[in-house]
Amino acid sequence: MYQKDLYDLQIDLVFKCNDFSNLSNHFINKSDNIIFESGFWEEVLLCWIKIILDEKDTSFPNFILYKKSFSLSLQIINDNEISSINQKWMNKSGSTDVLSFPIISDEDTTKDLNFIELGDLFISLETAFKQSLEFNHSIKKEMLWLASHGLLHLLGWEHNDDYELDNMLNFQEYLISKLD
């Protein structure tokens, strides 16, 4: 995992995971069960935020680069729940793999200089599992892929065209590679 000094960075993670014991007992390797643990996600998200701050990437609002404490929620839910959220908040029918609801805006520059509330991130474990089979990799890797995508959106990264999407996907690969 990315070993640079995390200096004074802190993350306040509100983590919720539905009971997927029937799925995890039958379809998920025991080594991948770490995706159900809050501590795993705290470490991963803090690592990624540190990398982003070190990179000083211009795809993020400048005020992000000077924060020391980040707060967000991550919820691992099922297809029915994400479909309901997708319909209610995005006005789209059907399930999806990840939804992010950023809170940040340019006005955040006037708030506490060290703390920022990023928003809410929802990942459908059922869709992630299907995609892990489709792409022939572990559920852990798929969950990392989806979490990195959602985090980048929470930090203000958008993909309005293929070029921006390619840049975002490449940066996701970079973030995930730093966890090895």
Curated annotation (Swiss-Prot):
Keyword Cytoplasm set for record: yes
InterPro entries tied to this protein: MetalPrtase_cat_dom_sf_prd, YbeY, YbeY_CS
Keyword Metal-binding annotated: yes
Record-linked Pfam families: YbeY
GO BP field: rRNA processing
Keyword set, alphabetical order: Cytoplasm, Endonuclease, Hydrolase, Metal-binding, Nuclease, Ribosome biogenesis, rRNA processing, Zinc
GO terms under cellular component: cytoplasm
Cofactor(s) recorded in Swiss-Prot or TrEMBL: Zn(2+)
EC number: 3.1.-.-
Binding site for Zn(2+): H149, H153, H159
Regions annotated as coiled coil: none
Locations listed in the record: Cytoplasm
GO molecular-function term, one example from the UniProt record: metalloendopeptidase activity
Gene3D superfamilies from the UniProt entry: Metalloproteases ('zincins'), catalytic domain
Family label: Belongs to the endoribonuclease YbeY family.
Function: Single strand-specific metallo-endoribonuclease involved in late-stage 70S ribosome quality control and in maturation of the 3' terminus of the 16S rRNA.
NCBIfam families in UniProt: rRNA maturation RNase YbeY
Name of the featured protein: Endoribonuclease YbeY
Protein source organism: Prochlorococcus marinus subsp. pastoris (strain CCMP1986 / NIES-2087 / MED4)
